[in-house]
A protein has these predicted regions:
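Residues within membrane-spanning alpha-helices of integral membrane proteins
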Residues: 14, 131, 135, 157-160, ...
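Polar-ligand-bearing catalytic/cofactor-coordination segments
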Residues: 1-5, 25-130, 165-235
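Alpha-helical transmembrane segments of multi-pass membrane proteins
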Residues: 17-23, 141, 159-170
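Short hydrophobic/aromatic-rich motifs at helix boundaries and adjacent loops
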Residues: 18-24, 152-154, 196
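Membrane-interfacial helix-loop-helix connectors in multipass membrane proteins
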Residues: 2, 140-155, 227-235
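Post-HExxH zinc-binding segment in Zn-dependent metallohydrolases
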Residues: 124-149
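N-terminal signal-anchor transmembrane alpha helix
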Residues: 10-34
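Hydrophobic alpha-helical transmembrane segments
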Residues: 6-14, 148-158
Length: 235
């Protein structure tokens, strides 16, 4: 069956997902750029803020490192490293401290055994495997007939659903890390009240990128279900 652009209205679902992702990405980049220009009153760098937050939470086995790139910051629970990017590591801006605090939030989650983080970590190998073979299985299934066709399509969709679940479980993980960041920055005095307000705006914008990503995945899954069900009805 031919699913060309002019005959397949479900491309609209993909387009909506792309637009949502682009808007969210643009918003977080703009907000980060704005608060990257504002020097924090404390004058702490992102690295110093991260190290202090970790110590405040009794975490002494996490290494704060530098990583190249822009907004490539992340916490790796496998080797307990907290990597801060070029605009964060040595920067004294409000944005840098906010991002560093957010990544520390993930380190604290790991330290405390935060369940959603553990679930997300367990899904990683399945998602990595599924992302490689889900679409090939579905495409092969669409060109076949009979029970084998349905079997391949169902397995492909199931693997894609795992990827959707991964994006959904990421939402509470990221939101919780941001809440921890805002709380510690306010309670520690590392940032003034108006500076914490800037961090809230930045982390809220960052959270929307994960919301947009999850929405895009759900829309792709919906499109898959519509196309495969339509194909089965025509068999």
């Amino acid at each position: 069956m031919y699913y060309g652009f002019y005959y397949d209205w479900t491309y609209i679902l993909v387009l909506i997902g792309v637009v949502l992702s682009l808007l969210a990405s643009s918003q977080v980049k703009g907000t980060f750029a704005k608060y990257s220009k504002i020097r924090s009153y404390s004058g702490m760098t992102g690295r110093e803020a991260a190290e202090q937050i970790l110590r405040r939470n009794g975490i002494y086995d996490v290494q704060v490192t530098h990583i190249a790139g822009n907004l490539t910051d992340h916490y790796d629970p496998r080797n307990k490293t907290l990597a801060l990017s070029d605009p964060v590591y040595n920067s004294t801006s409000v944005a840098a401290i906010g991002v560093a605090a957010h990544e520390c939030g993930h380190a604290v989650q790991h330290f405390e055994g935060y369940a959603p983080l553990s679930i997300r970590g367990a899904l990683v190998p399945v998602v990595n495997f599924g992302s490689m073979i889900s679409w090939p299985l579905i495409i092969i299934g669409l060109f076949m007939n009979g029970q084998m066709s349905s079997f391949l399509i169902d397995i492909g969709i199931l693997l894609f659903m795992v990827a959707v679940a991964f994006h959904l479980i990421t939402l509470p993980v990221e939101i919780n890390a941001s809440r921890r960041a805002v709380k510690v920055l306010g309670n520690s005095g590392m940032l003034r009240e108006n500076e914490v307000g800037g961090v809230k705006k930045l982390l809220r914008a960052a959270a929307m990128t994960y919301v947009a990503s999850a929405a895009a995945m759900i829309l792709q899954l919906l499109r898959l279900l519509i196309l495969t069900n339509g194909r089965r009805r025509n068999d």
